[in-house]
Amino acid sequence: ISLAGITMLSCLSPTLVCAEQPHGFIDYRHEYLDDTRTHADRVEFGTFFSNGIGLMGELRYNTDEGDKDKWDPSQFGNNGTGLSVVYRFKPLDDKKFWLEPMFWLDTTQYWSTYEYGLSAGYDFSKEWKVSGRFRYDMDKATDKSKGYGNDDRNNRRYDVWIDYRPQKTNFQYQLNLVYYNNGYLTWNDGHKNYTASFKVGYKIGSWIPYMSIADYKGVDKTSSNRQIRWRWGLTYTF
């Protein structure tokens, strides 16, 4: 489900935006996992107001469960939806520092998840920006999920973003580090996990095509195996 931008999505993180003028975005993203060899798609959209409030939605689709090397949008299954509200403000005289509480409601056929989080960031310059987020997720198992032996669970997630947008170029770079402490078996026979991803985008007017590569957990939750996660997409800002 998610988490990682500073101004008009120029730093490639649609869920982190400035409250300076009304604006919005639409983002399409495709994902491929090289070990499971499965595809997934996501469309995210949002609008943000000058008072700091932002509203976002997300639609996710994936290939039929168990199918590998298959990418046929007409055969994609619903992989969940999400709705979010955020509020960005600058509490200090130093206007380079900002805070952003958030709430996200995510639903799939197996879980209804209530996500509460707080982001903080500092804009060192036009080129360098750093932000972080703590998120607490409350997973409520659906009847279908309980049929597989699952129960309600709580999870913690910690994100760090480092954004670099060099002057006199349209390229944009982002490093995202994620640490998970989940209430269920996740990776390496334990409840903890991590993801490290690097993202490159190129701004062309209101469009930002991008690509990312990540060190991602493997299929077997009891081993330390990892796999590569590829993502590429296109963001339109307005």
Task: Show which residues each predicted segment covers.
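Detector for outer-membrane/organellar transmembrane beta-barrel domains
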Residues: 94-97, 113-185, 194
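Outer-membrane beta-barrel "beta-signal"
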Residues: 166, 202, 225-238
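Short glycine/proline- and aromatic-enriched beta-strand/turn motifs that initiate or cap beta-hairpins
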Residues: 16-68
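Outer-membrane beta-barrel architecture
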Residues: 44-46, 84-88, 117-121, 159-163, ...
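Residues that define the transmembrane beta-barrel architecture of outer-membrane proteins
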Residues: 37-41, 45, 76-83, 112-116, ...
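Sequence/structural signature of outer-membrane beta-barrel proteins
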Residues: 31-35, 60-72, 90-92, 102-111, ...
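Repeated loop/turn-to-beta-strand initiation elements of outer-membrane beta-barrel proteins
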Residues: 21-24, 51-57, 90-100, 126-132, ...
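Cleavable N-terminal export/targeting peptides
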Residues: 1-25, 238
